[in-house]
Amino acid sequence: MSGVMDSGASDYQLEAAISKVFASENAWFVTDEAIQILAGMGYMKDCGIEKVMRDLRIFRIFEGTNDILRLFVALTGIQYAGGHLRELQKAVKDPISNFGVVFGEVAKRGKSSLGIGAGNALGEMVHPNLNDVAAQVCKNTEMFGNSVEKLLIKHGKQIIGEQFLLNRLAAAAIDIYATTCMLSRCTQSLNEQRPSAMHEELVTRAWANEANMRIAQNLGALKNPVQLDTFKMLSQISQNVCENNAPVQGNPLGI
């Protein structure tokens, strides 16, 4: 995030939103794990962790709640894809004059359907040790773009109300961005031959492996019939509770 600002970029609200969500949620997770390890001692003032946890909790609310920022992250990506689809729609109406645009899009989608991606666009930017991780980031980015386009084609402007889907999109985007940041940091360490470089590569690979699984799961949920049906059920459950202004089911003890 600091690197983006230092580069002179004037628009970094998306990166800022992702960084805020990622940092605040992971800081909470790490502190919670620390208290779990310390057991009862974690609650003692002398230890100091309980104060850290108390203060950290507000960060998921300050400067925009993380729930709202997740929607912002997803909708920002959708806004870009929507603009691309509108341009393509105009081109299709006059294919002769816009042959290059239409042909390029057909070729791109044809390659995608055959499993031929855009390649490793990050290959020249990362240390050779990390080429395979960078290639997976590119693949995940392409999967993300395809998922966004399919959602837009299916839901159109109504996508803004599909918050279960948007939340999965945001989670995938955050994981992709976080992995890219780790690649950048680790590449610098490897290039400068820092003493911690090999350890940082290990951390980067471990993170990327887990992130890849989460990304596949979140993007897969957007087209999984069982998952989509579950989203509808959860939406109906929420509606029932709101209409009842209380849990719908009675107390199991009959009280």
What does each model-found stretch correspond to?
Residues 1-255:
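Flavin-dependent oxidoreductase catalytic core characteristic
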